[in-house]
């Protein structure tokens, strides 16, 4: 059956494929069946040790093929697996393959890799044969992780972490779940792979990786998605902003020698750099994809990326952008310590922390680490991310705060194993692992309970040691003139590999754990763990293989080969740049400006070169203007404004001294003609009047309070905008707390539904039958589906914190032209990615991470113990038409809840 489906709607490269298995000696028996059922060949062998009563047909479903090869002692059999878009093609490929001499095919394959290896940089002979072998294997794994259809698309890993615990038969919205996992393209992981290829001498693949990110993955606003499919399109689990992922491709452009490419600069580098300027230094989440705030590793990437952007701009003769980018990078470098070095923490007088939530590293702010871990004061949570400031050339290894922080992490998150030392991703004052991303072990600082159980499906566990952090520490040691310490780390990484030298994501540092007995539920079964050997996440991890290759060559050269010279020249070789005074006198921060342009005025050092840029929420092409400050230091510039809000960045440059200032103004209405504009009362984010927010500090007041809803169209796109009283980053994403569903009724639509997005879970239906539905959140691409659940197309989702707006943008040609009779039904609730459906749970009274049906001691029918919290409508706020009370509409004690939409007049 070629009628296959997947919830990965952008996987256009995947077509129904036939598979044929041929044996040079035929088969004694064979059977086809359904995975996990009695007809599965594996189940038949387990029960009867034979395929004698097998099956010859298994239409539809998840199919398995099992065959018996007739072979005896000292006899070889060749098997060939053929693929094709037709049955005949698959059979032909298999037959032609099995007809070849295997030794000859193997020899050709081996020679191809030998030719590739011959072109690589050679490690020093004194590293020894074992290290040399692992070096070549590491580079080969990175190269092998590149997709063969889309050059430069390097997967984060060729493994599926804990794939044994994820059933192949899972469905999402009625379609088979696409489990891409690490076999997708993440900009940060691609960059790490790029660095390994670059120092190894494979400039061709390094350039291909750069072009893949810009040509295929980059979003219209200039940013990079968290991850993508191999074709660069959005994956089902794409979501959340990470500024290091937006910055690294710019550095890759410079380091791979593409700075002279004019079109690449105009179409890709400028939008990317403008996005980083507008959103840096602290938007989105840090490199572990868990926390928002000011991250040393993220800001290091921003500084390096913007310095590279300035260098590229100079090559292109674009002096205004060069000054803007470099001055912004200078400001980030100037303030990195004030943002992320605490002087009131428990470990030392001064040290870098993992993340500073507000830019004040001395604030007594606590946050939950996630994945079943606890809540800790930000000053007591440390990681090694600050070492990126050294690797990328922003700070010297000898910097006192760096030196003090290295001692802190070595005392706090370093652990010894039978194969050498390693480091946790992060840690606290606890002597146990507080990272919950990994196979469960107890005692630990997390809530997992079954020792050896995998991280999914509960998304809780225990994090272990990451070999990439050993390489990171080793590169610091080299920069610190301590290669004697870096060498043993290279050896430890090699000894911690799996198979023939595959570098894992995590390594087990605890006591050995035996594998669970055969037949144990895979969701809780231990695969068996040995101290100093790989844990159960991913092996290989492409980043880890690249970091091993990089460290081996760095040790060989006695210096860090990949450190970008343009950054070290700017901040180390010639000393930190000076700082100029800069004041923006108008407009006032947060002012409302509804005109197409805004006049920006201010003062700085007389004769300084002032550059100002304005960027809207859609990013893309930004407005830029420049002028030389007058004799009194005053300056005036005009910039375009945009809908929602406009971020204005101003810089001043005079010789090697710079200055930077940034603010925003609230903009005008949506583009085009507004066809629907409805206000909603403030403070009604309590469902039927009793609902309560979770008690965790992660949930900010007003985050579920819809204040306005609007729809506009301009002949090309339709804009659907939902305004919230408060829109702040939560769990590392700007729309990380919310789950927004919008049901669209179009008159005359052939197929409609009145069901909620998740019938039986959301506990409501829709009054106006809908033919299209949108669902938006911060950790996945927006869903745009029809009444049957099929994908309609790709929607762009733009959030804007200053204006508190979340806007869906879709092509009018697909969505339709909105007119009288259309109805929009809005339902806002909480997102929880730890289970499916991704709706946050309700309990009788609020919990740390659950909504409360009522406050403690609440009265009224809905607060009665007889009301099951699982039966109430999961709607914190909606927009009702005139004459409809939200309190009444959402009260489940009055009968089935039916949401009324707002009609287009």
Where are these regions (language model features)?
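Surface-exposed, glycine/proline- and aromatic-rich loop segments on solvent-exposed faces
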Residues: 670-777, 831-835
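Long, well-ordered core segments of solenoidal/helical folds
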Residues: 142-149, 202-224, 258, 263-285, ...
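Ser/Thr-rich low-complexity repeats and stalk/linker segments
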Residues: 578-669
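Aromatic-rich carbohydrate-recognition surfaces in CAZymes
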Residues: 109, 177-282, 295-309, 313, ...
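Acidic/polar low-complexity flexible segments
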Residues: 667-679, 746-766, 814-905
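C-terminal capping/lid segments that line or modulate ligand- or cofactor-binding pockets
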Residues: 229, 236-256, 367-368, 376-396, ...
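Extended ligand-binding clefts on enzyme/binding-domain cores
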Residues: 13-16, 22-32, 39, 125-126, ...
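Acidic/polar, glycine-enriched structural segments that form the non-catalytic walls/loops
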Residues: 2-181, 563, 568-577
């Amino acid at each position: 059956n070629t009628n296959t489906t997947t919830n990965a709607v952008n996987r256009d490269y995947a077509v129904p494929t036939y598979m044929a298995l041929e044996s040079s000696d035929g088969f004694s028996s064979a059977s086809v069946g359904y995975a996990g059922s009695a007809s599965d060949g594996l189940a038949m062998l387990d029960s009867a040790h034979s395929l004698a009563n097998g099956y010859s047909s298994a239409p539809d479903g998840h199919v398995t093929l099992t065959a018996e090869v007739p072979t005896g002692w000292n006899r070889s059999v060749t098997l060939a697996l053929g693929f094709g878009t037709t049955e005949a093609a698959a059979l032909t490929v298999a037959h032609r393959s099995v007809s070849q001499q295997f030794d000859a095919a193997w020899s050709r394959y081996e020679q191809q890799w030998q030719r590739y290896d011959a072109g690589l940089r050679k490690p020093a002979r004194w590293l020894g044969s074992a290290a040399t072998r692992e070096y070549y294997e590491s580079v080969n794994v990175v190269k092998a992780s590149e997709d063969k259809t889309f050059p430069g698309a390097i997967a984060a890993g060729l493994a599926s972490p804990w794939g044994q615990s994820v059933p192949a038969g899972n469905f999402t919205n009625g379609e088979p779940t696409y489990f891409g996992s690490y076999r997708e393209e993440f900009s940060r992981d691609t960059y790490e792979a790029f660095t390994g290829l670059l120092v190894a001498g494979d400039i061709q693949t390094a350039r291909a990786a750069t072009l893949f990110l810009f040509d295929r993955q980059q979003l219209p606003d200039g940013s990079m998605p968290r991850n993508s499919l191999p074709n660069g399109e959005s994956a089902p689990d794409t979501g959340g902003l990470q500024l290091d992922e937006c910055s690294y491709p710019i550095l890759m452009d410079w380091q791979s020698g593409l700075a002279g490419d004019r079109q690449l600069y105009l179409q890709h580098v400028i939008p990317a750099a403008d996005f980083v300027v507008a959103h840096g230094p602290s938007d989105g989440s840090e490199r572990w994809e868990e926390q928002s705030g000011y991250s040393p590793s993220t800001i290091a990437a921003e500084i390096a990326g913007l310095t590279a952007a300035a260098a590229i701009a100079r090559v292109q003769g674009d002096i205004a952008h060069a000054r803007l980018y470099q001055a912004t990078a200078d400001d980030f470098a100037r303030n990195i310590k004030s943002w992320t070095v605490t002087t009131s923490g428990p470990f030392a007088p001064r040290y870098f922390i993992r993340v500073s939530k507000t830019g004040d590293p001395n604030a007594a702010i606590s946050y939950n680490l996630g994945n079943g871990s606890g809540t800790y004061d930000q000053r007591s949570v440390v990681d090694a991310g600050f070492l990126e400031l050294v690797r990328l050339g922003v700070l010297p290894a000898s910097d006192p705060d760096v030196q003090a922080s290295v001692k802190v992490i070595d005392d706090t998150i370093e652990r010894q194993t039978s194969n050498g030392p390693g480091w946790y991703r992060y840690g606290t004052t606890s002597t146990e692992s507080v990272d919950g991303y990994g196979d469960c072990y107890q005692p630990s600082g997390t809530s997992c309970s079954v020792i050896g159980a995998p991280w999914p499906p509960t998304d809780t566990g225990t994090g272990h040691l990451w070999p990439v952090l050993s390489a990171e520490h080793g590169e610091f040691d080299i920069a610190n003139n301590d290669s004697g310490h870096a060498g043993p780390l290279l050896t430890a990484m090699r000894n911690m590999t799996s198979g023939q030298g595959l570098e894992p994501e995590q390594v087990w540092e605890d006591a050995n754990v035996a594998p669970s007995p055969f037949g144990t539920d895979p969701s809780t079964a231990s695969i068996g763990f040995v101290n100093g050997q790989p844990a159960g996440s991913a092996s290989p991890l492409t980043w880890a293989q690249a970091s091993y290759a990089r460290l081996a060559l760095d040790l060989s050269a006695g210096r860090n080969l990949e450190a970008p010279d343009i950054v070290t020249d700017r901040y180390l070789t010639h000393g930190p740049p000076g700082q100029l005074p800069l004041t923006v006198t108008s407009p006032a921060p947060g002012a409302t400006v509804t005109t197409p342009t805004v006049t920006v005025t201010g003062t700085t050092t007389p004769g300084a070169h002032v550059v100002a840029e304005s960027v809207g929420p859609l990013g893309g092409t930004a407005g830029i203007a420049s002028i030389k400050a007058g004799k009194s230091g005053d300056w005036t510039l005009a910039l375009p404004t945009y809908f929602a809000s406009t971020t204005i960045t101003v810089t001043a440059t005079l010789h090697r001294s710079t200055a930077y200032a940034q603010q925003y103004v609230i903009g005008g209405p949506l583009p085009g003609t507004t066809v629907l504009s409805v206000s909603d009362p403030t403070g009604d984010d309590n469902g039927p009047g009793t609902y309560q927010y979770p008690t965790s500090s992660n949930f900010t007041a007003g985050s579920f309070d819809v204040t306005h809803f609007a729809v506009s169209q301009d002949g090309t796109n339709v804009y659907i905008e939902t305004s919230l009283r408060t829109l702040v980053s939560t769990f590392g994403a700007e729309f990380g707390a919310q789950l927004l569903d919008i049901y669209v009724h179009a008159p005359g639509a052939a197929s409609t539904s009145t069901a909620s997005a998740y019938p039986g879970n959301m506990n409501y239906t829709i009054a106006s039958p809908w033919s299209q539905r949108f669902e938006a959140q911060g950790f996945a691409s927006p869903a745009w589906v029809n009444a049957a659940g099929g994908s309609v197309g790709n929607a762009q989702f733009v959030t804007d914190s200053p204006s508190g707006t979340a806007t869906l943008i879709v092509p009018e040609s697909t969505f339709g032209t909105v007119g009288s009779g259309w109805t929009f039904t809005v339902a806002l609730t909480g997102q929880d990615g730890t289970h499916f459906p991704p709706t946050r749970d309700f309990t009788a009274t609020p919990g740390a991470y659950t909504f409360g049906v009522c406050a403690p001691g609440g009265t009224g029918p809905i607060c009665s113990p007889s009301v099951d919290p699982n039966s109430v409508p999961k709607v914190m706020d909606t927009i009702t038409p005139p004459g409809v009370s939200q309190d009444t509409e959402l009260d489940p004690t009055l009968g089935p809840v039916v949401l009324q939409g707002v009609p287009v007049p």
